[in-house]
Each structure stands twice: as structure tokens, then as C-alpha cells.
């Protein structure tokens, strides 16, 4: 109401707004509204990085071949599995590694020997980055130079 009264006084004196100025103000208001709507749309498409499922790593110490199926089930459920074969005998360990290697290959996964009798098996959604393979290869190549 006060603004309307002020506009009337300015109009009476001869300083009233022209129609162009009114149109410019309306246009600016519309542009601000459109910009806010575009920002809201962009924000609606943002996905939080932390909203995904947590990655789980399962550590297993199988003593017999009977436990190999549980390890394969973990891989099937897209979990990384670290297998420590120190409790298994040599023949059992070989059978377990063969079985889990086959399951890993069927699931397009990957495997890596981590240490003596310790293996890492991962499904296809996990990549293994390994710098130790190169170091191990270099150590074996230059083993003669150390003595």
C-alpha cells in the first residue's frame, strides 16, 4: 500500500515509471525464478557418494574342502574374501584354491596371492591394484646380485 501511495505521489509530480521500466523489473523477476528452478533441478540430480553399500571383506581360515562353498557364496554376494590356508593340509589347500579360483573365474572376478598360503579373491566389482608383483619380480631377477 505504501509503495502504491509513493508511486501516486511520483506520478503527480511527473516522475512516474515508464512502462519499459516496469516490464524490465517483471522480466528480471521471471529470470530469477527460472534460475532458481534450474538450480533446484540440478541439485535433485546429485547423488551422494556415500549412499552406496559398504564394501565388506571376509577373512576365512578353511581347514577342509567343505568350507570352500561358503567362500564361493561370499564371492557370489560380491564380497572380497581373504583366504588363509595355513590350517589346511597341502592337498586340501590345493583343492580349495582350485575350487575358489573356478568360482572367481565364473564370476569374472580376480585373485591374487598375498603371502605364503594366503590368497585374495574378489568379485568383478572390485579391482586389485598390485605394486608388489613388480617388486617381487625384481627381487627374484636380481637375487644373484645380492650375494
Curated annotation (Swiss-Prot):
UniProt entry tagged with the keyword Thylakoid: no
Predominant location category: cytoplasm
Alphabetical keyword list: Cell cycle, Cell division, Cytoplasm, Septation
InterPro entries: Cell_div_SepF, Cell_div_SepF/SepF-rel, SepF-like_sf
GO biological process: division septum assembly; FtsZ-dependent cytokinesis
Location(s) in or outside the cell: Cytoplasm
A Gene Ontology cellular-component term: cytoplasm
Similarity-based family: Belongs to the SepF family.
Oligomeric and partner information: Homodimer. Interacts with FtsZ.
Role summary: Cell division protein that is part of the divisome complex and is recruited early to the Z-ring. Probably stimulates Z-ring formation, perhaps through the cross-linking of FtsZ protofilaments. Its function overlaps with FtsA.
The protein, known as: Cell division protein SepF 1
UniProt lineage: Bacteria, Bacillati, Bacillota, Clostridia, Eubacteriales
Gene: sepF1
